[in-house]
A protein has these predicted regions:
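Bacterial N-terminal signal peptides
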Residues: 5-18
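N-terminal secretory signal peptides that target proteins for export/translocation
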Residues: 1-2
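C-terminal helical cap and adjacent loop that interface with cofactors, partners, or active-site loops
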Residues: 402
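Formylglycine-dependent sulfatase
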Residues: 16, 22-397, 405-416
């Protein structure tokens, strides 16, 4: 009899716990992040008529895009340091590309907070955090990680990362261009040559490929009947993989596409300016993503996080500036800091004796870099194209994005 009573009590407790778990799951959104690599907001929804990105464009049409979003770092690993921690990498020791340092004692990566709150957290599959992981971070993190592997009814946080637009893919040959190289807009800092046009056209082709990947993930969510329960983010990890974008903390290296969608059920968690088909001028950067995802899950972001939640239960006030940085990039050291208010970009070069265009083997594998440098050496580059290679570089730079989106007219010495 005693055994039967114990079993009955256990069954009641289990049923009660199951009901609580189901209730909690119903009160918390699923969160899906679809990410890509090395691309700026060169997408149709951002007004780029040369781009072919129908899936992200459709997401933006029913959601909202951010026009002033920065990565913090113009290269992948430090950018991911920022994302996973909610901290600026210079404050953690992970500023340099391919670092491996621990977080301070007691600090955690944001998926650990989510898992403690009952979320199933999957990452498919790039990590590259520049940080030593403080224990188990994900429920699964590999090429098979998927929200489908969670317990039935469990809320999920899932990342799917596409590498198809990575810098290395811009220069892969042979490549049959889908986007016509003749129709490329070549930025003022690049020479207008067939090699440069080919690289830019191939870059746009690769952005179309990651858009197709995004479409597959969105369809999978819809087919599973989960679209109405899931908050979606689409973003890239930093600016384009073209030279003078990737690795440089100016707008071309830091500005990223960020598109979000909040279904009706979770619209109360959206930023106040959120509306279907809208565009926000709020300044956000990657340091804000960790506190934001915790806030969306109903978790108070820890005080040590340096970012500010822009949505969810614990929103912070809008910020007047966002910040970027550059440290060692592969085999070349540098020290640069940058800031923007959305219109002006200020850059402080602490090592002006080093040119912007220091020789990085990985970057010189891109045809654009080689032909650009050769034209500079032969004296055939324009003034705007020569700035990148000159020594010394200006200690301070100031650009007005409204009149100079390519950031080639330095206003730092202007009396105005």
């Amino acid at each position: 009899m005693t055994r039967l009573l114990c079993l009955a009590a256990l069954a009641l407790f289990t049923n009660h716990f199951s009901l609580i778990t189901s209730s909690q799951a119903a009160d918390r959104p699923n969160i899906l992040w679809i990410t890509s690599e090395d691309h700026s907001p060169n997408m149709g929804c951002y007004g780029d008529k040369f781009a072919s990105t129908p899936n992200v464009d459709a997401l933006a049409a029913r959601g909202m895009l951010f026009r002033r979003a920065w990565s913090c770092a113009p290269v992948c690993a430090p950018a991911r340091t920022t994302l996973i921690s909610g901290l600026y990498p210079p404050s953690t020791g992970a500023e340099h590309m391919r670092s491996m340092v621990p977080l301070p004692v007691g600090f955690k990566m944001y998926p650990q907070f989510l898992r403690e709150a009952g979320y199933y957290c999957s990452n498919n599959s790039k990590e590259d955090y520049n940080l030593a992981k403080p224990g188990q971070v994900w429920d699964e993190s590999n090429g098979k990680a998927h929200w489908k592997n969670r317990t039935a009814g469990q809320p999920f946080f899932a990342i799917f990362n596409s590498t198809k637009s990575h810098e290395s893919q811009i220069r892969t040959r042979p490549h049959i261009a889908v986007h016509d190289p003749a129709k490329v807009r070549v930025p003022a800092y690049h020479p207008d040559t067939p090699e440069v046009r080919q690289d830019w056209a191939q870059y746009y082709d690769k952005v179309s490929e990651v858009d197709a990947d995004a479409g597959r993930h969105l369809k999978e969510l819809t087919d599973a009947g989960l679209a109405d329960d899931t908050i979606i983010f689409y973003y890239a990890d930093h600016g384009s993989g073209m030279p003078r974008s990737k690795r440089w903390p100016c707008n071309s290296g830091l500005q990223v596409p960020v598109v979000v969608h909040f279904p009706a059920k979770w619209k109360h968690l959206a930023p106040p300016e959120y509306k279907a088909g809208g565009a926000s001028d709020r300044l956000i950067s990657f340091v804000d993503f960790a506190p934001t995802v915790l806030s969306l899950a109903g978790i108070q972001p820890p005080a040590w996080m340096q970012g500010h939640a822009f949505a969810g239960k614990f929103p912070a006030p809008m910020q007047p500036f966002i910040f970027g940085f550059r440290g060692r990039m592969d085999e070349r050291i540098d020290c640069v800091r940058s800031a923007t208010d959305g219109r002006y970009v200020y850059v402080r070069n602490f090592m002006p004796h080093l040119s912007q265009g220091q020789h990085v083997d990985y970057q010189f594998a891109t045809p654009t870099t080689r032909v650009w440098f050769d034209l500079f050496k032969s004296g055939k580059a324009t003034e705007a194209q020569s700035i990148f290679w000159r020594v010394p570089k200006a200690p301070e730079e100031l650009y007005d994005l409204t009149t100079d989106p390519d950031e080639v007219k330095n206003l730092a010495a202007s009396p105005q």
